[in-house]
Amino acid sequence: MNWGIPFRHLLLVLQLALLPAVTQGKKVVLGKKGDTVELTCNASQKTTTQFHWKNSNQIKILGKQGSFLTKGSSKLRDRIDSRKSLWDQGCFSMIIKNLKIEDSETYICEVENKKEEVELLVFGLTANSDTHLLQGQSLTLTLESPPGSSPSVKCRSPRGKNIQGGRTLSVPQLERQDSGTWTCTVSQDQNTVEFKIDIMVLAFQKASSTVYKKEGEQVEFSFPLAFTLEKLTGSGELWWQAERASSSKSWITFDLKNKEVSVKQVTQDPKLQMGKKLPLNLTLPQALPQYAGSGNLTLALEAKTGKLHQEVNLVVMRATQFQENLTCEVWGPTSPKLMLSLKLENKAATVSKQAKAVWVLNPEEGMWQCLLSDSGQVLLESNIKVLPTWPTPVQPMALIVLGGVAGLLLFTGLGIFFCVRCRHRRRQAQRMSQIKRLLSEKKTCQCPHRFQKTCSPI
């Protein structure tokens, strides 16, 4: 029998077995500090062969002995594991939990006379301080990285703004829209890992608001917050600058504790009313021209540096009629582009100007509308009814004057009438007197003649 060939085959197999394991290409895996990573290692065949994980110093970390998982005396001993259920499929991964920056190094998997190298790079991205920041404050994100790495960071804010940087990334002047989840991508050697950081921007829902009211109407000021906290404690104050006043003054001060509001001090004119629960609400009993102006509500939160601010404006409208003049006026901060108009109902505007007062002389009878509008959108409207001319306040005085004149004329006429009548009677009396006198003279003259006629001889 020829034993040469089998012996040569056995020798070749023995030599191959003694050869060192072949090293495969190195893979790069990026991990996040505090997270879990799985380093994969696969055999060419589905088998339950032996495998070992080591670090770059050839210290055994994890392996398989029979059907059991064995762990070495490395610093990862309490944070490593493997998926035993996948061993029979030729998958021999190493799972590292609660990653640390110092876990960054090269790990070697030995299986089937081959070596697979995996370079693990662990990064951490954290906010410089609290993730609850006041509107207007700055956000700084700091990247922790292993020595020798040169990563880049790109973050996208909830409002879609992109910010790029290196190991430090700064975002000045945070806005209310920046509140939410920030998505940051760390890149290294064409590999990426994604971080999500929740940032809460403490702010009011609106930076500024304007309330439009007719004179005499009740005014409601609302200051809703753009965030929700379980425990909310602080203090606030509303300062008001009236348009007609030379300086601003404090209208109300209050405390906020566990979302409940208590008033500390309030002015007597005007006497504001405040709700006892969030959102912050203030009520002004009447909108008057002397109250029109601008206010600034500040809210200081406990354990926070700085204050929240919201500006509020009050615009008051008045429509009046005096004598033959119909006037429409507004008080308070208004944009120069706003239009103020006076129009008869269902008719075109009689007057329309970019002004704070308009008027119409001798207005027609009917319902007039005073309108404050912005690009065709009516912001404020006040109606006033113009009555017919005769009942206007000026007529009674005219009637009194006319009555006086008529009375004077009548009195004068009656006086003249009675004077003429009196003269007429006097003349008539004089004439009668003359007639009587003449008649009496005629009688005395007739007696002798009558006597002579009777005594004459026959």
UniProtKB/Swiss-Prot annotation:
GO terms for molecular function: coreceptor activity; MHC class II protein complex binding. It is found in: Cell membrane. Palmitoylation and association with LCK contribute to the enrichment of CD4 in lipid rafts. Phosphorylated by PKC; phosphorylation plays an important role for CD4 internalization. Disulfide bonds join C41-C109, C155-C184, C328-C370. The modification Phosphoserine is found at S433, S440, S456. Glycans are attached at N42, N281, N296, N325. It is a single-pass type I membrane protein. Residues 1-25 form the signal peptide. One of its GO terms (cellular component) is cell surface. Residues 26-125 form the Ig-like V-type domain. Keywords: Adaptive immunity, Cell membrane, Disulfide bond, Glycoprotein, Immunity, Immunoglobulin domain, Lipoprotein, Membrane, Palmitate, Phosphoprotein, Repeat, Signal, Transmembrane, Transmembrane helix. CDD domains: CD4_CD, IgV_3_CD4. The chain crosses the membrane at residues 397-418. InterPro entries: CD4, CD4-extracel, Ig-like_dom, Ig-like_dom_sf, Ig-like_fold, Ig_C2-set, Ig_sub, Ig_sub2. A lipid is attached at C419, C422 (S-palmitoyl cysteine). GO terms for biological process: adaptive immune response; cell adhesion; T cell differentiation; T cell selection. Residues 126-203, 204-317, 318-374 form the Ig-like C2-type domain. The Ig-like V-type domain mediates the interaction with MHCII. Integral membrane glycoprotein that plays an essential role in the immune response and serves multiple functions in responses against both external and internal offenses. In T-cells, functions primarily as a coreceptor for MHC class II molecule:peptide complex. The antigens presented by class II peptides are derived from extracellular proteins while class I peptides are derived from cytosolic proteins. Interacts simultaneously with the T-cell receptor (TCR) and the MHC class II presented by antigen presenting cells (APCs). Forms disulfide-linked homodimers at the cell surface. Interacts with LCK. Interacts with PTK2/FAK1. Binds to P4HB/PDI. Interacts with IL16; this interaction induces a CD4-dependent signaling in lymphocytes. Interacts (via Ig-like V-type domain) with MHCII alpha chain (via alpha-2 domain) and beta chain (via beta-2 domain); this interaction increases the affinity of TCR for peptide-MHCII. CD4 oligomerization via Ig-like C2-type 2 and 3 domains appears to be required for stable binding to MHCII and adhesion between T cells and APCs. This is T-cell surface glycoprotein CD4. The lineage of its organism: Eukaryota, Metazoa, Chordata, Craniata, Vertebrata.
